[in-house]
Amino acid sequence: MTVSQVRRVAVIGAGISGVVSTAHLVAAGFEVTVFERNQQTGGICINRPCYKNLTTNVSTPLMRIKLRAWPENTPDFVHHSVVNEYIRDIALSTGVDERTIYGARVEHVYKDGGKWHVNWSVLDDNGSIDGLEERRLISTFDAVVVASGHYHSPHIPDIPGLSEVKKRWPSRVIHSKRYRTPEVYRDENVLMIGGGVSSMDISRDLGPFAKMIFQSTRNGDADPPALMLPDNADANDTILVTNGTQVHNIHRDIFYIPDPTLAFVGIPYFNTTFTLFEFQAIAVTAVWSRTACLPSTTEMRREYLVKQKQTGGGRKFHSLKDKEKEYVRDLMAWINDGRNAHGLVPIEGHTAAWFEAMDKLWDEARAAMKERKEQQEKIIKRIPFSADCTSVELPHLN
């Protein structure tokens, strides 16, 4: 199966990356089926995957997509329920909702005989006492978009001793993905492993409730200045792992090099998410509708290896920190070269309003970061990792 033969497409996930991917593919005439394990669109922005007080840390002008503007007078920073409603409105207005199978669990995706096979299951009401019966199905497609995002599978760092603690006290070690409300940590000592945005936001959320908060990190991307661990600060009641997650052989963080009928939308991090993911969805649509041409497999592989060397590989391969503007500029230039060749109107990349909002965000972020650091230093004691980040020891639990 080549990209010139793509017609039927499976999209896995109905968060923002799945919704915008489906919307653009449908507009281009593709037959799309969306598999969503939850009962509604929204991804991480629906109530169950989010912690109660989660608000956006990227302003709504930066998250505006081409398919739909935010409602008039929407604040710059909003509760996750507002974001979920925005995604839901997009899904309803673009035909995504009617093409989505809700409650569908995708269990296996593989290619055989030139077709992609999606093994999935759904629970049906069979009218019996038990009520529900699992129905397993296999559907075939020409191409697949994996739009489950980079928040779906939590990354647990390989720290000696951590897994043993988790086995012995399962409720005392959780990933930030499982964090919901701060009240359950009232009067507890909490150790945060990781120094990124999740760690900072959850620490602030825990501040009024936890007895003490300790943060263990090595060169976190959002680290405030570290404080030395006090002598009596080795006892912790709960460990929160806030490290991020970590795809190999992909071109432009989108196309699987050995077979570009498999695409990923929503993998990069340290970006403005919604707009970035829509540009990726536009790229997928352009390639599969043959208005944009991918380089040869050899050239894609060469570019991949160059980037691998530049970033050091691993999770940082997908980081767009200080690179988003360049990434989108290059992506849209490539897409528009193809559109020009086909006599199509070019698609605008980042708008003037987006750049204005980005400049405003950076000014506000610097001020907010200063304030947040001051707040955190009042509630967090920081444990500086050694260079090799070797272990976590909880003597009082032995």
UniProtKB/Swiss-Prot annotation:
UniProt keywords, alphabetically: FAD, Flavoprotein, Glycoprotein, Monooxygenase, NADP, Oxidoreductase, Signal
Glycan attachment sites: N53, N57, N119, N126, N236, N243, N271
Disruption phenotype: Impairs the production of ustiloxin B but accumulates intermediates such as ustiloxin F and C.
Residues annotated to bind NADP(+): G194, G195, G196, V197, S198, S199
GO terms assigned for molecular function: flavin adenine dinucleotide binding; N,N-dimethylaniline monooxygenase activity; NADP binding
Signal peptide: 1-22
Residue pairs linked by disulfide bridges in the UniProt entry: none
The protein's enzyme class: oxidoreductase
Residues engaged in binding FAD: G13, A14, G15, I16, S17, G18
EC number: 1.8.-.-
Top-rank lineage group of the source organism: Eukaryota
InterPro entries: FAD/NAD-bd_sf, Flavin_mOase, Flavin_mOase-like, FMO-like
Family (UniProt): Belongs to the FMO family.
Main function: Flavin-containing monooxygenase; part of the gene cluster that mediates the biosynthesis of the secondary metabolite ustiloxin B, an antimitotic tetrapeptide. First, ustA is processed by the subtilisin-like endoprotease Kex2 that is outside the ustiloxin B gene cluster, at the C-terminal side of Arg-Lys, after transfer to Golgi apparatus through the endoplasmic reticulum (ER). Cleavage by KEX2 generates 16 peptides YAIG-I to YAIG-XVI.
Entry protein name: Flavin-containing monooxygenase ustF1
Protein source organism: Aspergillus flavus (strain ATCC 200026 / FGSC A1120 / IAM 13836 / NRRL 3357 / JCM 12722 / SRRC 167)
